[in-house]
UniProtKB/Swiss-Prot annotation:
Organism: Paramecium bursaria Chlorella virus 1
Protein name from the UniProt record: Minor capsid protein P11
Region (Hydrophobic): 7-23
Oligomeric form and interacting partners: Interacts with the major capsid protein.
Gene symbol of the encoding locus: A352L
One Pfam short name: P11_C
Location relative to the cell: Virion
Domain characteristics, as noted in the entry: The hydrophobic region might anchor the protein in the underlying inner membrane.
One cellular component term from this protein's GO annotations in UniProt: viral capsid
UniProt KW S-adenosyl-L-methionine keyword: no
Regulation: induction: Expressed in the late phase of the viral replicative cycle.
Keywords: Capsid protein, Late protein, Virion
Record keyword Nucleus present: no
Role according to the record: One of the minor capsid proteins that constitute a network internal to the major capsid proteins and outside the lipid membrane. The minor capsid proteins glue and stabilize the capsomers. the p11 zip protein binds together the neighboring symmetrons.
Length: 207
């Protein structure tokens, strides 16, 4: 018998042994199933039950913890659960209206408001110096502009330029009924050319 045959026989015996142990554990009458321990089992104990873990002292139970009730109602044995509210109520007062009372008087609060300090340096350019000073020449300006000259136009369109002449253009004709007179055609320059053409579409006043 060689070495390979011995190894195969030992492996078969080991497998048969494991199968037998598994079959034996499954056929036991009082065999308990495999149970995994719950890591939160110690925190599931209630203070009202029979079992209580002493390590869970930091768990807060509202029905058993009365250390944080700070409301005093005037009696020695009567305590009101108000969830850590530091409000002292006299006997016979309504607890709901206890927080609505003003803390300070409004007259005392006016004294606590800081006042705005006045600027130490005066203004370099006050508003009174920004306007021109009154002068007698400006006060007598009404003598040079009487009321009868308010609607008078002192500009004459035909005074400085000729009307109906060759060199006139009369672009700003204030007193003409027509737009402007006919621009005459005159070839000027070294090549006898001009860029200004006569207005041949100008209609006469009567015609």
């Amino acid at each position: 018998m060689d070495m390979h045959m011995i190894v195969k026989v030992v492996a078969i015996l080991a497998v048969l042994f494991l199968v037998y142990k598994l079959w034996e554990s499954m056929n036991k009458p009082n065999a308990s199933p495999l149970k995994i321990q719950n890591p939160y089992e110690k925190y599931m104990n209630s203070a009202e039950g029979g079992e209580y873990d002493a390590e869970d002292d930091d768990i807060y139970y509202p029905e058993t913890d009365a250390e944080d009730d700070d409301i005093y109602t005037g009696e020695t044995d009567d305590m009101y659960d108000g969830e850590d509210d530091d409000i002292y109520v006299q006997e016979g007062d309504d607890i709901e209206d206890a927080e609505d009372e003003p803390y300070d008087d409004s007259a005392d609060m006016e004294q606590d408001v800081p006042k705005v300090q006045q600027p130490m340096m005066p203004l370099l350019t006050p508003s009174s110096q920004l306007l021109p000073k009154p002068s007698p020449e400006a006060a007598d300006f009404a003598q040079f502009a009487p009321k009868n000259l308010q609607a008078q136009n002192f500009l004459t369109a035909t005074q400085w330029i000729g009307v109906n002449t060759q060199g006139s253009s009369l672009k700003n004709a204030n007193y003409d009924l027509r737009a402007d007179p006919i621009i005459p055609k005159a070839d000027v320059g070294p090549w006898m050319m001009s860029s200004v053409d006569p207005n041949i579409y100008q209609k006469p006043l009567f015609g």
